[in-house]
Amino acid sequence: MLAEKTRSIIKATVPVLEQQGTVITRTFYKNMLTEHTELLNIFNRTNQKVGAQPNALATTVLAAAKNIDDLSVLMDHVKQIGHKHRALQIKPEHYPIVGEYLLKAIKEVLGDAATPEIINAWGEAYQAIADIFITVEKKMYEEALWPGWKPFDITAKEYVASDIVEFTVKPKFGSGIELESLPITPGQYITVNTHPIRQENQYDALRHYSLCSASTKNGLRFAVKMEAARENFPAGLVSEYLHKDAKVGDEIKLSAPAGDFAINKELIHQNEVPLVLLSSGVGVTPLLAMLEEQVKCNPNRPIYWIQSSYDEKTQAFKKHVDELLAECANVDKIIVHTDTEPLINAAFLKEKSPAHADVYTCGSLAFMQAMIGHLKELEHRDDMIHYEPFGPKMSTVQV
């Protein structure tokens, strides 16, 4: 436990963090990645450019400051971030570097207002927070299905929508990975380690991709959406490489499956609480794995499948979804094409899905923020709203 004086100083900085938090974290990333270019092999530079990662870190720092008297209340958030850290192979030796540049950024942004007393207090607080993460992540490393990065062969590559490719991969001979014995949880993701020779890239590029199925019978399957170029931003570095360059027979490195986005096993065998699977675009991927699990365990449970995409061509996994839903005894299938229909809103959800359902939703950060807001507006219980955004999850959290 931090000293009371230290905690008081930290809490006194909450107002300035609310105003300047993102400025501090942008400064932190700029300085750290300029002076420690080796970390560009880990950090997603797109998330830096669009502000998602600085926003997420600012939210995390603010949450820590507000809860400095009892950091245990943040444990769910710590575990979510810890899964990403383990998947990216972030290690204890990285934490002192982060701490050094975070304190420097606070000093740079706040200037004379960042007194030695404040900097010392945040130094102590950061170490306490880092120790929590290191402890949580140590257990995750111990429980990982395999250590580090392992080589896999791409055995299949298939378009499941006009802009989404499903990859099937198998571990290379001698990797020590036995597919048949891997206990995959529906909703988990794998992390790929690539080195695209595009866009003047000099570094490894790591990305998380949700698994399409918990079944490992024919290999691990994950889906990748082509992130097209848009104003001020080039095409997605890794998605472009995987869509255009990676081919069957190529080798790709993966870290072990990670993530805590998982269907509630206590509800999977009952029929009173319906299941709502609400997705947008490639966000359908982890929900497809959950649908498979639900159908396998109990096809009689009421299911509401709500899938949004721009048009029919970008609607992923149509055939597989229809095959699974055909096995269900009580299902509502709702497809939304936003080129001709309005975006999903609270009124839509109120009409199309029951208020007492267990809801799982996945999509872009903007989609997730909207869906969480709509569900809360409709007074869905927080513990019945489960979500996985494609981007830093703390960007969707209000503290």
Curated annotation (Swiss-Prot):
Domain Globin: residue ranges: 1-138
Domain (FAD-binding FR-type): residue spans on this chain: 147-264
Site entry: Influences the redox potential of the prosthetic heme and FAD groups: K84, E388
GO molecular function: FAD binding; heme binding; metal ion binding; nitric oxide dioxygenase NAD(P)H activity; nitric oxide reductase activity; oxygen binding
Signal peptide positions (record): none
Cofactor note as given: Binds 1 FAD per subunit. Binds 1 heme b group per subunit.
Site (Involved in heme-bound ligand stabilization and O-O bond activation) location in chain: Y29
Highest taxon of the lineage: Eukaryota
EC number, UniProt record: 1.14.12.17
Catalytic activity: 2 nitric oxide + NADPH + 2 O2 = 2 nitrate + NADP(+) + H(+); 2 nitric oxide + NADH + 2 O2 = 2 nitrate + NAD(+) + H(+)
Needed co-factor(s): FAD; heme b
Family note: Belongs to the globin family. Two-domain flavohemoproteins subfamily.
Further details from the record: Present with 13000 molecules/cell in log phase SD medium.
Task performed by this protein: Is involved in NO detoxification in an aerobic process, termed nitric oxide dioxygenase (NOD) reaction that utilizes O(2) and NAD(P)H to convert NO to nitrate, which protects the fungus from various noxious nitrogen compounds. Therefore, plays a central role in the inducible response to nitrosative stress.
Domain free text: Consists of two distinct domains; a N-terminal heme-containing oxygen-binding domain and a C-terminal reductase domain with binding sites for FAD and NAD(P)H.
Listed name of the protein: Flavohemoprotein
Annotated source species: Saccharomyces cerevisiae (strain ATCC 204508 / S288c)
